[in-house]
Amino acid sequence: MDLLLLEKTLIGLFFAIIIAIVVSKLRSKKFKLPPGPIPVPVFGNWLQVGDDLNHRNLTEYAKKFGDLFLLRMGQRNLVVVSSPELAKEVLHTQGVEFGSRTRNVVFDIFTGKGQDMVFTVYGEHWRKMRRIMTVPFFTNKVVQQYRGGWEDEVAHVIDDVKKMPESATNGIVLRKRLQLMMYNNMYRIMFDRRFESEDDPLFNKLKALNGERSRLAQSFEYNYGDFIPILRPFLRGYLKICKEVKQRRLQLFKDYFVDERKKLSTTTKSMDNNALKCAIDHILEAEQKGEINEDNVLYIVENINVAAIETTLWSIEWGIAELVNHPEIQKKLRDEIDSVLGPGVQITEPHTHKLPYLQAVIKETLRLRMAIPLLVPHMNLHDAKLAGYDIPAESKILVNAWWLANNPATWKRPEEFRPERFFEEEKHVEANGNDFRYLPFGVGRRSCPGIILALPILGITLGRLVQNFELLPPPGQSKLDTTEKGGQFSLHILKHFTIVMKPRSF
């Protein structure tokens, strides 16, 4: 059976090469394409570039081919933007033309071919989903409604750490406890639910399935089948696993959270106009009105599990690592907190706006260790123009936001973790995209609306950890290992580090 499949694939590949040569010649007469390495039929630049399209590799290509270049990855066109001016063109000036989302074989599975909000094409469905999600998730009212819960969650983290004697001597892997905190932060908003401990069976099941989804979707190993359809039969096993994980996750969301909330709302009769609604109540109302269907509801839950929880957790983890590796910055932050609030006065969300050095630490973390360094890929549904070049329809557009924020031509000593830059030469720069050199959350129509949740959670969490503990590397180490691990468009730390947390006395 395998030999028969191989034979059919090779025959198909032969004919595909012939067709690709003809099509390539026809298309080359039509388009003035951006520069890039010379492609070969069928494979394009895939054999030269490989699967690992991370931000650092793409930066090297930008240095060679310029701020706008094209990679032909099999049958897909990949356009990479590496300057603030071109980023403004793609994300703002021509935001409608480039406002769609690219598709691939794995994300089609996990999003039901774009039934969600984050990965759907630009159009009526996206506008409807964005509107439905904004009120329950992405307003200052939501921040004020749930900030007390976020403050409680980090207080639980601090109490739990203080109960672990090893945390002050040999150290602990804090990420595990912070992961529980982030799930509780988001599940309070979504379902008015929280998990009591890391040992909660439902929490562990949820965490395992979300982790498997992230691993499968962020892996580069399926690129060959996505780029070159004739090779897709070799992905059957991989795609089968993706479908199984997708089905198990959606069933878990439905059985344990969505349906449970439906039962609660119909049996208690407490969901009147005066009662506080959680996010799923608003979303279920939209379903009842016929604006969305049950699948859309589940894919909204899927988006929050992926886009809100893990990305914020990665940024917290990076922030801690940089503070441990720069004790002078950690001390300066602690001194600011003690001076402004008074020793032992625990940070709340309103306090974070009175702590400029804390804000600078957050901005510097997001600059140097951008969680989504290439942003979520964009796509033009129709043929478009960019910088005088033709961009064929359905090209995948990557904005190398990490390079925009780390280019030594436009940033002073960008390789250094230096929050002071946001008091000095970059004092006007904010995380909301007011400067196209710095776009940790993107900008424009498809920017990340989660910025309104992420920034206060980062401030509360990093602030309370620093004011309650001295954060140190484990015995025998002078610094933490900050080796990066990239994915399809993610950037997190390779090894979940151990840190020593010495409680402070007030």
UniProtKB/Swiss-Prot annotation:
Q: What is its EC number?
A: 1.14.14.91
Question: In chain numbering, where does the motif Nuclear localization signal 2 fall?
Answer: 247-254
Q: Where in the cell is it found?
A: Nucleus
UniProt cross-references to Gene3D superfamilies, sorted A to Z = Cytochrome P450
Which Gene Ontology MF annotations are present? heme binding; iron ion binding; trans-cinnamate 4-monooxygenase activity
What triggers production of this protein?
Repressed by MYB4.
Question: By its UniProt entry, which PROSITE patterns does this protein fall under?
Answer: CYTOCHROME_P450
Q: What is its main location?
A: nucleus
This chain belongs to which protein, by name? Trans-cinnamate 4-monooxygenase C4H1
Which cofactors must be present for this protein to function? Answer: heme
**Which gene is this protein's source?**
C4H1
- In chain numbering, motif Nuclear localization signal 1 lies across 161-168
Q: Matching InterPro entries, A to Z?
A: Cyt_P450 (IPR001128), Cyt_P450_CS (IPR017972), Cyt_P450_E_grp-I (IPR002401), Cyt_P450_sf (IPR036396)
Function of the protein:
Component of the floral volatile benzenoid/phenylpropanoid (FVBP) biosynthetic pathway that controls carbon flux to pigments essential for pollination or UV protection, to numerous pytoalexins synthesized by plants when challenged by pathogens, and to lignins.
Q: Name the domain of life this protein comes from.
A: Eukaryota
- Listed binding positions for heme are C448
Species this chain originates from = Petunia hybrida (Petunia)
